[in-house]
Structures are given as C-alpha cells and as structure tokens.
Amino acid sequence: MIRKINLEHILFLDIETVPEQENFNLLDDAKKELWEHKSKYQRKDGISAEEFYERAGIWAEFGKIITISVGYFNYTGNDRTFRVTSFYGEEPNILKEFKTLLDTHFNQPKHLLCGHNGKEFDFPYIARRMIVHQIELPEKLNLFGKKPWEIAHLDTMELWKFGDYKHYTSLKLMAHVLGIGSPKEDIDGSMVKEVFYKEKDLDRIIRYCELDVITTAQVFLRLRNDNLLEEEEIKRV
C-alpha cells in the first residue's frame, strides 16, 4: 500500500524539545506542584521531582520545542532530491513558520506527515504547543471529529509494528537493522537539554534533528523497498 504513495506528497519531520525552564527551581510554585504530581508515577528509587525535571521536555505541558526539522522529496525527470530545512528560534515563531509551510504547501488531502513515533510524540506535541500559544491548528494537525482513516499521518515506527501494539523500536535500531548507514551522531536525545541550556549550541541540535529526518526518510524508503538516498541527493536549504 505505501508503495502507491507519491513521495512528493509526504512531509517528513522531527522535533527537538527541552524543559520550559533550565531547572526546576525556576518554575513558579504552582508549576512545581503540578510537576511533582505529574511525575510521581514515573519517578523511581527515591528520585525527587527536581532531579526528574531533566526529562520534563517529553511532556508538552512542561516542555517547549526548540527546533522543527522537515524534509521532502522532489523529482525532476529521473533526478531525485531530498530537501531538508529547519525552523528554530523562539517557540511561537517556530510554530507559526511551520504552520505557514503546512498551510501553503502541504494543505491538500493527498498530503501526508511522516515521523518516527510521530503519532505518539511529534504530531500531538506540536498541536498542543500551538494551542498553548493560541495558534490556530493547521488542517493536518486538527484531528477533532476526524475518523482514523481521515488522519493524514504516517509513522515509520507504527509501520514496523505490523499490528504489534506493544512493540517499540527506536529510529537508531531500525536504521541499523535495515542496513541504513548514517554519519556518527554528535549527540543523542538525552543530551539535548544540556547542549541547549549549558552549551547554548543550537546549531549542533539542529544538525542532529535534521539527521533524524533524513534517517526517517531512509527508513520509509526501505519499508517500500525503494533505493536509499545517496549523499549527493540530499540538499540542506
């Protein structure tokens, strides 16, 4: 079925998130209490809410988006390119620019969004943060009242599950199993908060995020049994 999808109709994406504040003590008292309540079932072995705040970026209610990277295929005759770009800066601006992209270029029923674990993380996270900032949801993220088959979302992790709802496979593992080579990653997801707040190296995070977009596209190609992208076909714009 996925072989019938026109690759030019898909927007591949990945987001990077961090806690809304650099540390727990910068939260107001109400937010501290809410975090303590929210995290108590995840915390183990006597870990305090303050210590566990390192992971707050996972939740849209306590985190924020620092970059959205996207990629899309373009065909000119027999020539194939995969263009990658990123939105970064203040979160409201990131979200507005991303919304403009969707509203302008990916607004038709034929268009699809694709991410790795996108249905459980990236897509709802973006939608929730848009609502927080009073940004009208673009059609591709507005799921209210839609039937499951009307939702234009693809998820490489879900495609790999083959109905096994318990199965979780990281993008890195999938790429390795499917024989997809990639440059050595400079960082991983657990390091993003420190690189953002301590090192203040957003460019490093953007490179990591863009690599995940490229890898997601490569995984999707393998799931279709298509040829993988060559380095010269990838254009960062």
Tell what function each PLM region has.
Residues 1-100, 104:
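Conserved RNase H-like, two-metal-ion catalytic cores of nucleic-acid enzymes
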Residues 3-9, 63-89, 106-207, 211-215, ...:
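Metal-dependent phosphoesterase core characteristic of DEDDh/y 3'-5' exonuclease domains
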